[in-house]
Amino acid sequence: MERALLILKPDAVQRGLIGAIISRFEQRGLKFQGLKLMQVDEALARRHYAEHEGKSFFNGLVSYITSAPVVVAVVAGKPGTVELVRAMVGATNPAKAAPGTIRGDFGVDIGRNLIHASDSPESGERETAIFFQPHELIGEWNRALDNWIYE
């Protein structure tokens, strides 16, 4: 199964959008393999955003993601899951995100764009390893409705 890491950022948590956002992924047939509410510390934030270190916005990213609790989740599905998740999330700038996407429906500002999602299957695996220990993840499991979603 292909996996993507999701982070419901501080603005999503503070605005009470956790349930509304999570339900969208469940309704599309994706399976949650891990889910937790946590406070990201500076070291973890710097590790997660390491690819942006040295860029003008790096310190702002670290400061924001550590400012309040976040929800971190791993969703899994068939090949193409990361692409599906990215389409559901919408453009980085909520002003340019299509209606029907998470950012298009709930987002207000590019600096408060609600959610992070892995941008490739490789990133999904790398980011999952940053936020979850193997024992915190549920592997393959079947829901009663899976036969109605997947061929």
From Swiss-Prot:
Active site: H116
Binding site for ATP: K9, F57, R86, T92, R103, N113
Subcellular location: Cytoplasm
Any one of the GO CC terms: cytoplasm
Named cofactor requirement(s): Mg(2+)
InterPro entries: NDK-like_dom (IPR034907), NDK-like_dom_sf (IPR036850), Nucleoside_diP_kinase (IPR001564), Nucleoside_diP_kinase_AS (IPR023005)
Keywords of the record: ATP-binding, Cytoplasm, Kinase, Magnesium, Metal-binding, Nucleotide metabolism, Nucleotide-binding, Phosphoprotein, Transferase
Reactions accelerated catalytically: a 2'-deoxyribonucleoside 5'-diphosphate + ATP = a 2'-deoxyribonucleoside 5'-triphosphate + ADP; a ribonucleoside 5'-diphosphate + ATP = a ribonucleoside 5'-triphosphate + ADP
GO biological process: CTP biosynthetic process; GTP biosynthetic process; purine nucleotide metabolic process; pyrimidine nucleotide metabolic process; UTP biosynthetic process
SMART domains given in the database record: NDK
Record-listed E.C. numbers: 2.7.4.6
GO molecular function: ATP binding; metal ion binding; nucleoside diphosphate kinase activity
Disulfide bonds: none
Known function: Major role in the synthesis of nucleoside triphosphates other than ATP. The ATP gamma phosphate is transferred to the NDP beta phosphate via a ping-pong mechanism, using a phosphorylated active-site intermediate.
NCBIfam families tied to this protein: PRK00668.1
PANTHER family, per database record: NUCLEOSIDE DIPHOSPHATE KINASE
SUBUNIT field: Homotetramer.
Family: Belongs to the NDK family.
Protein name: Nucleoside diphosphate kinase
Organism of this sequence: Chloroflexus aurantiacus (strain ATCC 29366 / DSM 635 / J-10-fl)
